[in-house]
Amino acid sequence: GRCCHPACGKNYSC
């Protein structure tokens, strides 16, 4: 899955 917001930190992916 994608994590598309700033709170994801290093996991941010769009």
From Swiss-Prot:
Give the recorded effect for residue 12 to A.
8500-fold loss of activity
**Compartment(s) of residence:** Secreted
**Sites bearing Cysteine amide, chain numbering:** 14
The consequence of residue 11 to A is:
3-fold loss of activity
Outcome of swapping residue 6 to A = 73-fold loss of activity
| A Gene Ontology term for the protein's cellular component | host cell postsynaptic membrane
Q: Which cysteines are joined by disulfide bonds?
A: 3-8, 4-14
On tissue specificity, the annotation reads: Expressed by the venom duct.
InterPro entries in the cross-refs: Conotoxin_a-typ_CS
Alphabetically sorted, this entry's keywords are:
Acetylcholine receptor inhibiting toxin, Amidation, Disulfide bond, Ion channel impairing toxin, Neurotoxin, Postsynaptic neurotoxin, Secreted, Toxin
What is a single molecular function from GO for this protein?
Answer: toxin activity
Modification note: Amidated; synthetic peptide with a C-terminus free is 6-fold less active than the amidated peptide.
Query: Where the protein is mainly located, per its record?
Result: secreted
Give the consequence of mutating residue 10 to A: 9-fold loss of activity
State the domain notes. The cysteine framework is I (CC-C-C). Alpha3/5 pattern.
- Family per similarity comment: Belongs to the conotoxin A superfamily.
Q: Could you tell me what this protein does?
A: Alpha-conotoxins act on postsynaptic membranes, they bind to the nicotinic acetylcholine receptors (nAChR) and thus inhibit them. Specifically blocks mammalian nAChR at the alpha-1/delta binding site. Shows very low potency in blocking the alpha-1/gamma binding site.
The entry's protein name is Alpha-conotoxin MI
